[in-house]
Amino acid sequence: MNFSESERLQQLSNEYILGGVNSPSRSYKAVGGGAPVVMKEGHGAYLYDVDGNKFIDYLQAYGPIITGHAHPHITKAIQEQAAKGVLFGTPTELEIEFSKKLRDAIPSLEKIRFVNSGTEAVMTTIRVARAYTKRNKIIKFAGSYHGHSDLVLVAAGSGPSQLGSPDSAGVPESVAREVITVPFNDINAYKEAIEFWGDEIAAVLVEPIVGNFGMVMPQPGFLEEVNEISHNNGTLVIYDEVITAFRFHYGAAQDLLGVIPDLTAFGKIVGGGLPIGGYGGRQDIMEQVAPLGPAYQAGTMAGNPLSMKAGIALLEVLEQDGVYEKLDSLGQQLEEGLLKLIEKHNITATINRIYGSLTLYFTDEKVTHYDQVEHSDGEAFGKFFKLMLNQGINLAPSKFEAWFLTTEHTEEDIQQTLKAADYAFSQMK
């Protein structure tokens, strides 16, 4: 493929935009470098770049675009609302309608508040949990990404009894001292952290199904034990469902798994492609939030009518019969096809799939925790990424990310993807 216009625009971008991208995950640094492809438009399962190349898209904006690009029903809703006004700074009926649809789908959201991103949603749930418990420390799991606020950019200490250290420049040591990081799926490490820190722990922050070091399921009983241990300690359980809400079924992962948290953060999919975030949970906890309580959260754009209208339209598409069955079927076809090709070409790789989402890891062991992904073969992934890109298959440029299917992918897309993977694997020996 020819990428000359993307390369020209990237050089121009570097003159004005720091690093040439507005999010570091969009650069190709993790896959060997080079100018990232500059996209021009998207329709359904496909993206089209500035050089006229067409791609089958499995990036899907890192997860939000579950109904494909420019879905007619959502696009129409956005256009209709834009003609009426996009921001009023007042309550609207759309906020009420959208909140009701969300609570009908996710019953644990007894009360809801909207923000503008997943980062804001998680950041605020932590503040609310601290206000409710009157404690300061939180526990998070290694490898899970919860946005870029200071408190969650903290790396693990040497063990469950050790405090974390800043995972980014600009995060104060004083902030990192409020965070304990333990391995996902390691209930003994979690018990040790709770036993050591006791009544200092306000909340534990959990991705019920991990989406940020690929797709990783909790081990049987893990989430149930986290709930029990936490509540026995007076610690709140916060689920980060920014990726997982409405990804696997019409609702949240918590309902699919049958384990209910105290608070939930959500975003991505529910905005229909527009900026959104939100959080909710038990009424008695949520009543800590202003104007009813002392925990402050506000936002000029929070609950704006454009995002509310897009979210309502998105849920109207997803609540139709057969949507998630199709995603699961396509995911199964893609997984089975890739596994056959891995065997055919004797590639050291494994796959985690959860319904219509999967991750291909270049490692010889089944992935259940972050360290396995950290030590997987990033060089092999980078080569695979470039070989697929040059055949019109758009993946996330990182070994840690997932492939996302949409309602608009077809069996023909799967077959074309497998054909490209067959060639890519053949060039990796």
From Swiss-Prot:
Q: Where is it localised?
A: Cytoplasm
Q: In which pathway does it act?
A: Porphyrin-containing compound metabolism; protoporphyrin-IX biosynthesis; 5-aminolevulinate from L-glutamyl-tRNA(Glu): step 2/2
GO molecular function terms noted in the UniProt entry: glutamate-1-semialdehyde 2,1-aminomutase activity; pyridoxal phosphate binding; transaminase activity
Which reactions appear under catalytic activity for this entry?
A: (S)-4-amino-5-oxopentanoate = 5-aminolevulinate
Which cofactors are named for this entry? Answer: pyridoxal 5'-phosphate
Kindly list the biological process annotations in GO that this record carries: protoporphyrinogen IX biosynthetic process
Instruction: State the superkingdom.
Output: Bacteria
N6-(pyridoxal phosphate)lysine modification, residue list: 268
Instruction: State any GO CC term.
Output: cytoplasm
- Statement: the UniProt record of this protein carries the keyword S-adenosyl-L-methionine: no
**Enzyme Commission no:** 5.4.3.8
In Pfam terms, one family for this protein is Aminotran_3
UniProt-listed CDD domains: OAT_like
Would the keyword Cytoplasm turn up in this protein's UniProt record? yes
| Keyword entries, A-Z | Cytoplasm, Isomerase, Porphyrin biosynthesis, Pyridoxal phosphate
**Similarity annotation:** Belongs to the class-III pyridoxal-phosphate-dependent aminotransferase family. HemL subfamily.
Task: List, alphabetically, the PANTHER family matched.
Answer: GLUTAMATE-1-SEMIALDEHYDE 2,1-AMINOMUTASE, GLUTAMATE-1-SEMIALDEHYDE 2,1-AMINOMUTASE 2
Subunit organization: Homodimer.
Name of the protein in its database record: Glutamate-1-semialdehyde 2,1-aminomutase 2
**Organism of provenance:** Staphylococcus aureus (strain MSSA476)
Q: By which gene is this protein encoded?
A: hemL2
